[in-house]
C-alpha cells in the first residue's frame, strides 16, 4: 500500500499508513485539482480527495458472489498486518473455496477506530475480478480519446493489472478458468524448483502482460487520433515486479531475484518529445511527482519531496534501499541482474518474438508453426497422434481455449514430449508438471486458434518405450487398445 502513494506524492512514510487522502494531503491530486479536470480511477486506494474527484461506486453484487468473496480473502492477505493475517484461511494464488472465512476483517471489531484497518476492510469488499480491472483502464482510454476540453485534464488510473490470476489473452479474452489452473507455489508463495512449471507460469503471465500492453497502446493511439499526444505528459510504471526464478518467492525480493521484483518499467513521454532515450540510472517511484511538476513548470515551496525530477540533470542516488519482507536490501546500480534475467528468458523462449514464441518454449518449441505431417520424430520408441474436435471457438463469448491440459496415466512410459496441433499445425508445446506426474500443460499460439471450428491433434513422443494412456482434460480419451489408439471409442491410426 506504500507504492501508489509514493508515486502520487513523492514521499514515503516511515511507517505504513492507509493510502487515503487524509494521510497524503500533498499530492498530484491536490496540486492539480484546482486547475485541472480530474479523471481518476483508483483500484485499491483513495488518494484523491472526494471534493476533487468523483468516486466510482463499488461493483454491484450482480458480480458472481463467490468470486467477490474469494477476492476479499486474497486482498486481506495482501493488506492486513501479520497479527490479523495469521487468522485468515490459507491461500496461494487461487480464487476458490476459501470465501467462507472472509469475515475475519469484515465483521466484529477488527480495525474499529484504526484508519488503516478500516480502510483495508472497506476496500476488501470493493474488489472485483479481472473484467473490472479492464473496465477501469478502458474508461480512461475512452475519455482520453475525445477531443481536448478547454480546461486541462489530469488522468490517473491505478489498476492491479497484471496481477494474478493470469487468465487473460492479449485480446482480453479468458484463456483458462483460473481456479482450475493454480500456480505452482508452496504455502509460503515460493515457486517450485521444477523449471518447467515456472516456465508455464511465465507463459500465462506474458499473455496477461500483453493484454495490459494492448490497452496502453490503445491509450497512445487514442491520444494521437484526438490530436492530444504532443500536448500530453504520459507516465507508465508499476509498483513491483514478479520473480520467475525457480525456488524463490514470487513477490518478496531475494538475492537471487532482487532485480526481477524491484526493477520495474518507467516510461515518461513529455509534450513535444520527438525521439526516445534510455536512462539506466536508478530511479524510484517517488521521482514521478517531481518529474511531472518539472514538465508542468510548477513548484510548491512548502512541499518536502523526497524524489527528484528525472529531467533536470539532478544526480540520482547510486544505490537504492528497498524493504523486502522484514529486511532491507540494496539494489545495485549495475544492470547485471536485469541482463541475466533477460538472458534466462531468452533461453526459455528461443524461437522468436511475439505470441508464437511464447507458445514455443525450449528446444521442443522449434516445431511450433509446422505441419504435423512434416515432423521428424527421429528414433522415438513410441509415438501417438490423435484428433479431437474442438467446440466452436467464439471470442465474442469472452473465452478462447488457449490453455490445454493433457494427462498421461502411468500405465506405460511417460512421453518425453507433448505437442498440440490445431488443424494439423503445431500450435504449442506441453511441459511436464512436478506435483501432478503425467500432466502436461500447453499454451497455444493465439494466431493458430482463430474463431471457428477446429480439430486439435495431440502428438506424444517417448524415447524410452511404449506410451501409456492419455486423457484430455476436456473429456476425450486417448487409449491404446489391441485394435489401435482410440479416442472416445473411435479407432485411430498411428
Regions found by a protein language model. Name each.
Residues 1-494:
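Catalytic domains that recognize anionic headgroups
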